């Protein structure tokens, strides 16, 4: 009898964990990159080749610029030069 109760309890726990894992929405992984500070200087536009915005799960919003040399630089999305670069990159 004790064995049945133990096995049944274990099965209920496994089912609960599987249910939680399967019910998570696709793409709900934790953010892979968050910025905790912004660059203090404006990047030269010809250094920037791409950008992405950080996840809304991050503590502060940021635009991450990727440079020709493969560096990633965090920038404040409220700065006018950042908005200008994003607009320009979207057009190209």
Curated annotation (Swiss-Prot):
Detected in B-cells. Residues 1-23 form the signal peptide. The gene is CCL4L1. Disulfide bonds join 34-58, 35-74. The keyword Signal applies. Belongs to the intercrine beta (chemokine CC) family. It holds the Pfam family IL8. InterPro entries: Chemokine_b/g/d, Chemokine_CC_CS, Chemokine_IL8-like_dom, Interleukin_8-like_sf. One of its GO terms (molecular function) is CCR chemokine receptor binding. This is C-C motif chemokine 4-like. It comes from Homo sapiens (Human). Keywords: Chemotaxis, Cytokine, Disulfide bond, Inflammatory response, Secreted, Signal. It is found in: Secreted. The lineage of its organism: Eukaryota, Metazoa, Chordata, Craniata, Vertebrata.
């Amino acid at each position: 009898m004790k064995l049945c109760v133990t096995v049944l309890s274990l099965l209920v726990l496994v089912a609960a964990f599987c249910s939680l894992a399967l019910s998570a929405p696709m793409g709900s992984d934790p953010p892979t990159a968050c910025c905790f500070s912004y660059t203090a200087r404006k990047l030269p536009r010809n250094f920037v080749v791409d950008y992405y915005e950080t996840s809304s799960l991050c503590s502060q919003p940021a635009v991450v610029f990727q440079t020709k040399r493969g560096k990633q630089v965090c920038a404040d999305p409220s700065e006018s030069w950042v908005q200008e670069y994003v607009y320009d990159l979207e057009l190209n």
